[in-house]
Amino acid sequence: MTFIRKPAGQAKPQKYSTDAYGRPAGKFRRNGPIRKKVCRFCADKVEIDYKNLSLLHTFVTEKGKILSGRMTGTCAKHQRELDTAIKRARMIALLPFTVN
């Protein structure tokens, strides 16, 4: 009876994929697993209004750029409404286009 041996250099499959530094890639961060961002407009039933400047300022960078939905966690529907509200507020000079 003959036994077939595995080659010595064959590695075991890992449970999680790792990056170049041996850390888990994409599944974990330093304090635990990555949480999915929840759309605050869907969760709290908040209406998006172009006159609500305190709300709109949280979705604009200090340079005046609109933050993406990936950064803020908003869903696609509310991101579109947010974009139009910010653009309306800019057109009637409630928000600046750029910061000097």
Curated annotation (Swiss-Prot):
Keyword Ribonucleoprotein (UniProt): yes
Keywords per UniProt: Ribonucleoprotein, Ribosomal protein, RNA-binding, rRNA-binding
Membrane-spanning segments: none
Keyword Nucleus: no
Positions of region (Disordered): 1-23
GO molecular function: small ribosomal subunit rRNA binding; structural constituent of ribosome
A GO BP entry: translation
InterPro entries, per the entry: Ribosomal_bS18, Ribosomal_bS18_CS, Ribosomal_bS18_sf
An annotated GO cellular component: cytosolic small ribosomal subunit
Membership in a protein family: Belongs to the bacterial ribosomal protein bS18 family.
Quaternary context: Part of the 30S ribosomal subunit. Forms a tight heterodimer with protein bS6.
Protein purpose: Binds as a heterodimer with protein bS6 to the central domain of the 16S rRNA, where it helps stabilize the platform of the 30S subunit.
Protein name: Small ribosomal subunit protein bS18
Organism encoding this protein: Endomicrobium trichonymphae
Lineage per the UniProt record: Bacteria, Pseudomonadati, Elusimicrobiota, Endomicrobiia, Endomicrobiales
